[in-house]
Amino acid sequence: ATYKVKLVTPDGPVEFDCPDDVYILDQAEEEGHELPYSCRAGSCSSCAGKVSAGTVDQSDGNFLDDDQIADGFVLTCVAYPQSDVTIETHKEEALTG
C-alpha cells in the first residue's frame, strides 16, 4: 500500500506518497526534501518528529520510550506509514529539552 505523508516543516508543509515498506525519511529525501537526521538507525533523536494524524510503524527504532511514543513522537528514519499520516518535523528539541 502507498499512503500520503504530510510533513509540517519550519519552512512550510510538504506532501508526498510513501509506500508502506519505505521509511518516511528515505522517501522524503527521494522526493528532494531535506530533513534532519544523524544515525539513520532509530537510536538517536536527530530525526524526531511528532505525529499529529495517522499512524506509523517504528518498531525498528529503540531510542524512544513507551511514554514518548504514546505522546506521538516518531523517529522518521525508522518509521513506515500505516495510514495517511501528518508529522511535524524538527522536534528533537521538544523531545530532549
UniProtKB/Swiss-Prot annotation:
| Pfam families the record matches | Fer2
Q: Which GO terms describe its biological process?
A: electron transport chain; ferredoxin metabolic process
Main localization, broad class: plastid
Instruction: Please state every residue range assigned to the domain named 2Fe-2S ferredoxin-type.
Output: 3-93
Q: Which InterPro entries does the UniProt entry name for this protein? A: 2Fe-2S_ferredoxin-like_sf, 2Fe-2S_ferredoxin-type, 2Fe2S_fd_BS, Beta-grasp_dom_sf, Fd_pln
Cofactor binding note of this UniProt entry: Binds 1 [2Fe-2S] cluster.
List, in alphabetical order, the Gene Ontology terms for molecular function in this entry. 2 iron, 2 sulfur cluster binding; electron transfer activity; ferrous iron binding
Cofactors that this protein relies on: [2Fe-2S] cluster
- So where does [2Fe-2S] cluster get bound? C39, C44, C47, C77
Q: Which UniProt keywords apply?
A: 2Fe-2S, Chloroplast, Electron transport, Iron, Iron-sulfur, Metal-binding, Plastid, Transport
Q: Where in the cell is it found?
A: Plastid, Chloroplast
Q: Which GO terms describe its cellular component?
A: chloroplast; chloroplast stroma
PANTHER family the record matches: FERREDOXIN, FERREDOXIN-2, CHLOROPLASTIC
Q: Which family does it belong to?
A: Belongs to the 2Fe2S plant-type ferredoxin family.
Q: What does this protein do?
A: Ferredoxins are iron-sulfur proteins that transfer electrons in a wide variety of metabolic reactions.
Protein name per its UniProtKB record: Ferredoxin
Tell me which species this is from: Lycium chinense
